[in-house]
Amino acid sequence: MIASVRGVVTATGPDHAVLEVGGVGLAVQCAPGTIADLRVGQPARLATSLVVREDSLTLYGFADDDAKALFELLQTASGVGPRLAQAVLAVHPPEAVRAAIANADTAALTRVPGIGKKGAERLVLELRDRIGPVPVGADSAAGVTTGAWPEQVRQALVGLGWTAAQADQAVTAVAETVDGAVPPVPVLLRQAIRLLGRTR
C-alpha cells in the first residue's frame, strides 16, 4: 500500500500529475482541484490510494488524508468504483459530500456525472451511518488560481464527461460572473458543474 508520495512535480494534466520520487516518475490520478494546487518544478505531498486491478495498478492522489479516506469509503458503496469516487470529489469538497449524504441531499449528489437519482439514493442508504461527523459551516475550498483558469476548468469538465462545446459554454457563463478577485479553480469548477446540471 502506498499511503502517500512526496516529490517534485514534473508534469500535470487535466486528470493527473507526475511526481518524481527517488528518480522515478509516478503518475498519480488527481481531481482538478488537487491539480490546481500543484506547480511544476515545486515539491508536493499527496495522500494516495493504490487501486489494484488484474491488468493495471493505478495510484490516486489527494490533497489530504481526509479526501483519501472519503475516496476509499465511497468505493464501499454498490456500483462505485475509483473513477466515480474521484468524480464525486472533483465536484464537491469532502465536507460537502459528507453533508449531502448525511442530509440525504440527492440533488447535490446527482450533480456528479455518472450518478443518477437511484445511485444517489443508494449512496445515502449505504453510507449515511458510516460517513462520520459532518462539520458545521459553509462550503470551503482551497486552491490557487492562475490566469489560465478557463482552460483548467474546461479540461476538467471534459475529463468529467461533458463535451468540449458544453465545457466552453459553461466556462463562458462562469467567466461572466467573475468580477474582481478570481475565486480558486475548484470553486469555479463547481460553479460550472452547477450550470451544466441545470441544462441537463
Swiss-Prot record:
GO terms for molecular function: ATP binding; four-way junction DNA binding; four-way junction helicase activity. One of its GO terms (biological process) is DNA recombination. It is found in: Cytoplasm. InterPro entries: DNA_helicase_Holl-junc_RuvA_I (IPR013849), Hlx-hairpin-Hlx_DNA-bd_motif (IPR003583), NA-bd_OB-fold (IPR012340), RuvA (IPR000085), RuvA_2-like (IPR010994), RuvA_C (IPR011114), RuvA_C_sf (IPR036267). It comes from the Bacteria. Residues 1-63 are annotated as: Domain I. GO terms for cellular component: cytoplasm; Holliday junction helicase complex; Holliday junction resolvase complex. Its main location: cytoplasm. Residues 64-142 are annotated as: Domain II. Residues 143-151 are annotated as: Flexible linker. Pfam families: HHH_5, RuvA_C, RuvA_N. Keywords: Cytoplasm, DNA damage, DNA recombination, DNA repair, DNA-binding. Belongs to the RuvA family. The RuvA-RuvB-RuvC complex processes Holliday junction (HJ) DNA during genetic recombination and DNA repair, while the RuvA-RuvB complex plays an important role in the rescue of blocked DNA replication forks via replication fork reversal (RFR). RuvA specifically binds to HJ cruciform DNA, conferring on it an open structure. The RuvB hexamer acts as an ATP-dependent pump, pulling dsDNA into and through the RuvAB complex. HJ branch migration allows RuvC to scan DNA until it finds its consensus sequence, where it cleaves and resolves the cruciform DNA. Homotetramer. Forms an RuvA(8)-RuvB(12)-Holliday junction (HJ) complex. HJ DNA is sandwiched between 2 RuvA tetramers; dsDNA enters through RuvA and exits via RuvB. An RuvB hexamer assembles on each DNA strand where it exits the tetramer. Each RuvB hexamer is contacted by two RuvA subunits (via domain III) on 2 adjacent RuvB subunits; this complex drives branch migration. In the full resolvosome a probable DNA-RuvA(4)-RuvB(12)-RuvC(2) complex forms which resolves the HJ. This is Holliday junction branch migration complex subunit RuvA. It comes from Salinispora tropica (strain ATCC BAA-916 / DSM 44818 / JCM 13857 / NBRC 105044 / CNB-440).
